[in-house]
């Protein structure tokens, strides 16, 4: 799904994966990234929601929200797919138009009012200032034009980030890129891939840890002469 037109094999694999999660009674929240076709990704989203699979493909002028209850009360999950200033401005008058990615994200966040007495989680797919990237990968920021100041997310108890392939925390332990499950370039050969697990109890009591992934076929770098490698 690193493309707006994923292969039939990728679609079938995602379908099988979502079915397995549904059979385990796991709620799923999905958002579109910068490589995705948001309209295609969200096809049938209303039907999927009946199975607790919530897909947000496009920004529609307001943050999508899904609330789940546990023993500590409600957790509000806000979904913000990849946005550009133009995506936000189409819902604004010319006098209200925003400039820059930080302003665009900030405006999108202001479309909802958070209950600070309850737990709030946001899913976002943006390039946060200070992120460490793989320069050979597809997530390079050119000139910092699409950088977003991570402080715009300060009111959220956890910030689940996508876009960057390398797993890492930004600004605080509860703001994290989970990274990709597989390596997409040789620049990631020495990167340990993992799954990020968040243990969220009552408000303010959140623990974050990771479980390493071991691929069936790893990416390795071999340096030698052409003749010796052959």
Where are the predicted features?
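Extended recognition/assembly regions associated with phosphoester-bond processing machinery
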Residues: 2-31, 35-230
């Amino acid at each position: 799904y690193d493309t707006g037109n994923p292969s039939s094999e990728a679609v079938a694999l995602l379908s099988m994966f979502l079915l397995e999660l549904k059979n385990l009674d796991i709620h799923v929240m999905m958002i579109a990234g910068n490589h995705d076709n948001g309209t295609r990704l969200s096809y049938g989203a209303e039907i999927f929601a009946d199975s607790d699979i919530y897909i947000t493909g496009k920004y529609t002028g307001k943050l999508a929200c899904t609330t789940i209850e546990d023993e500590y009360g409600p957790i509000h999950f806000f979904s913000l797919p990849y946005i550009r200033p133009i995506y936000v401005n189409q819902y604004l008058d010319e006098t209200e138009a925003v400039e820059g990615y930080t302003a665009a994200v900030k405006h999108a966040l202001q479309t909802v009012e958070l209950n600070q007495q309850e737990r709030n989680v946001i899913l976002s797919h943006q390039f946060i200032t200070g992120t460490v990237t793989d320069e050979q990968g597809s997530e390079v920021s050119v000139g910092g034009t699409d950088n977003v100041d991570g402080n715009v997310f300060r009111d959220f108890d956890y910030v689940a980030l996508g876009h960057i392939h390398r797993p890492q925390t930004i600004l605080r332990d509860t703001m994290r890129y989970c990274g990709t499950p597989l390596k997409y370039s040789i620049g990631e050969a020495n990167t340990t891939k993992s799954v990020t697990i968040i243990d969220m109890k009552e408000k303010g009591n959140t623990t974050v840890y990771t479980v390493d992934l071991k691929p069936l076929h790893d990416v390795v770098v071999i340096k030698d002469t052409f003749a010796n490698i052959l």
